[in-house]
């Protein structure tokens, strides 16, 4: 921190020397003052350019001095004390919420304000050219800066003006907007009640007057007809099975169990297997 202060003091001293040299003050005595050179070839336009260079050097020196001062202040702050501009962003509270964020924040110890310096436009007016000043932005206190609102508070402000019974119409009209809709805990029941007019439930006494046959759904009758159709189709398929065969089965006459029957079965061209139980002839 001491080195930063020493650097800022040296840069301030250098700036004062440059300003005294540019404004045409009497020459300072000392080994640092260079001897004036009298040259006839030097044109006033070149002198004006040299003054411009000195002015730019002084501007750079002052900007470096301001940056070093800010760094020194950041290093000098304790760890427990955050900077004021860090509180300007969204901390969860806003103007719409219960209390302001300035009332609930802990008190920040005030530091000793540094000595005021002349404005940027008054420091450098050697060539009568107005300089741009950055003091207009830095002089605004953080308490008066516009602070952005959080998303829930903005949505609450947008839907706060709607009445309790008119939010359904607003939802239908603003359905294509990207802003969310703030509803209550029973929002689904409200939607069902308002958009779908549900019939009232009938009493138990009225249910007794209606016969049970009418209360059955038609799906039961459709199921019975489907089962009957399947049974009829199965019986028809069994009756038509013999007509679809190329060699319909037919009953054969009973033959005597002897060698003549075996010979007859061997000579015929039937595809049925030959089953012969009497093997006495073998």
UniProtKB/Swiss-Prot annotation:
Region of interest (Inka box 2), ranges: 256-282
Region (Disordered): 21-50, 92-127
Places the protein is found: Nucleus; Cytoplasm
Domain of life: Eukaryota
Region (Inka box 1): 163-200
Keyword annotations: Cytoplasm, Nucleus
InterPro entries hit by this protein: FAM212, Inka
Family designation: Belongs to the INKA family.
Entry's free-text remark on domains: Contains 2 Inka boxes (also named iBox or inca box). The Inka boxes bind and inhibit PAK4 by binding a substrate-like manner.
Functional description taken from the UniProt entry: Inhibitor of the serine/threonine-protein kinase PAK4. Acts by binding PAK4 in a substrate-like manner, inhibiting the protein kinase activity.
UniProt protein name: PAK4-inhibitor INKA1
Organism: Mus musculus
């Amino acid at each position: 921190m001491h080195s930063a202060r020493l650097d800022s003091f040296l840069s301030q001293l250098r700036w004062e020397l440059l300003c005294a040299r540019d404004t045409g003050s009497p020459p300072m005595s000392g080994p640092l003052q260079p001897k004036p050179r009298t040259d006839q070839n030097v044109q006033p336009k070149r002198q004006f350019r040299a003054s411009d260079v000195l002015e730019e050097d002084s501007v750079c020196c002052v900007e470096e001095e301001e940056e070093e001062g800010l760094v020194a202040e950041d290093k000098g702050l304790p760890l427990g004390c955050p900077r004021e501009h860090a509180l300007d962003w969204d901390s969860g509270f806003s103007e719409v919420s219960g209390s302001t964020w300035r009332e609930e924040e802990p008190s920040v110890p005030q530091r000793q304000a540094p000595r005021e310096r002349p404005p940027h436009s008054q420091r450098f007016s050697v060539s009568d050219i107005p300089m741009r000043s950055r003091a207009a932005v830095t002089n605004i206190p953080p308490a008066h800066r516009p602070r952005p609102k959080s998303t829930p508070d903005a949505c609450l402000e947008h839907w706060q003006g709607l009445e309790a019974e008119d939010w359904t119409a607003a939802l239908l009209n603003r359905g294509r907007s990207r802003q969310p809709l703030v509803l209550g805990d029973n929002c689904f029941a409200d939607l069902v009640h308002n958009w779908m007019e549900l019939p009232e439930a009938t009493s138990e006494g009225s249910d007794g007057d209606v016969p049970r046959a009418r209360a059955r759904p038609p799906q039961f009758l459709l199921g019975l007809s489907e089962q009957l159709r399947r049974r009829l189709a199965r019986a028809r398929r069994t009756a038509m099975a013999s007509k679809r065969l190329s060699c319909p089965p037919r009953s054969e006459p009973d033959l005597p169990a002897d060698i003549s029957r075996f010979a007859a079965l061997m000579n015929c061209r039937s595809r049925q297997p030959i089953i012969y139980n009497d093997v006495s002839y073998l």
